[in-house]
Design a protein with these regions (language model features):
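Short amphipathic alpha-helices and their capping/turn segments at secondary-structure boundaries
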Residues: 1-5
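Extracellular glycoside hydrolase catalytic/binding regions
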Residues: 6, 10, 19-170, 176, ...
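Aromatic- and carboxylate-lined catalytic core of secreted/periplasmic carbohydrate-active enzymes
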Residues: 168-203
Length: 203
């Protein structure tokens, strides 16, 4: 892939995997999936047996191996990985500790879905991901917080985030405006607000 994309101006970065994790204990042979979500399943585990090794060191070795392969073909494009938002000390982002990843990646990226009842969790995630490397919130969407307060959250934290990418379901606001469901109205509200966000968080 890196060989084919190395000279393309369309390639901004390589995201090594979507929401990878290092399991805390051995998993069954072939059990690479984390479980179905919305009808989809995808590979997230990067090993099936940690064999007593520190999870963060397994993640570091995995990133280094992929980075070395990519850099042998493409010295230009950036490299990152989309982190699961996790701040429990025993998990530390499921092995992908931001402090460790900042030493290996060109920028950090995290997926963030703040909860209305516990906004402090999302704030803690951003704090944990604040390192010497730029931070991009690679996914955000009002799944558990209404569009208006979530937009306030984004504006409040623009100073510590280099870029924000909203999860996008493929329907533009114009199409959603003709919808009849609450979900369509909610998504329309969010996308309209999102389009205006550059006035407050634009660089």
């Amino acid at each position: 892939m890196a060989r084919a994309a190395a000279h393309s101006p369309a390639v901004f970065c390589y995201n090594l995997r979507n929401e990878p994790f290092v399991p805390g204990q051995a998993r069954a042979p072939g059990d690479w999936l984390a479980g179905e979500l919305g009808g989809f399943s995808y590979v997230q585990a990067i090993t099936l047996d940690p064999a007593g090794r520190p999870r963060s060191e397994i993640a570091r070795a995995w990133v280094r191996r992929l980075r070395t392969v990519i850099r042998s073909e493409d010295a230009r494009a950036l490299i990152t990985v989309g982190l699961l938002p996790e701040t429990r000390p025993t998990d530390s982002f499921f092995g992908f500790d931001p402090a460790v990843m900042a030493e290996e990646l060109d920028f950090l990226s995290v997926h963030l879905y703040p909860r209305a009842q516990k906004p402090e969790e999302a704030r803690a995630v951003l704090q944990a991901c604040t390192t010497a490397k730029p931070l991009v919130v690679e996914e955000i969407f009002p799944l558990a917080m209404a569009p208006a307060p979530l937009m306030t959250f984004v504006r409040t934290h623009c100073h510590r985030v280099a870029g924000w990418l909203s999860f996008y379901w493929g329907q533009p606001p114009e199409e959603l405006a003709r919808g009849t469901t609450q979900a369509e109205a909610w998504t329309h509200d969010w996308l309209v607000r999102w389009q205006l966000l550059s006035r407050d968080c634009g660089r």
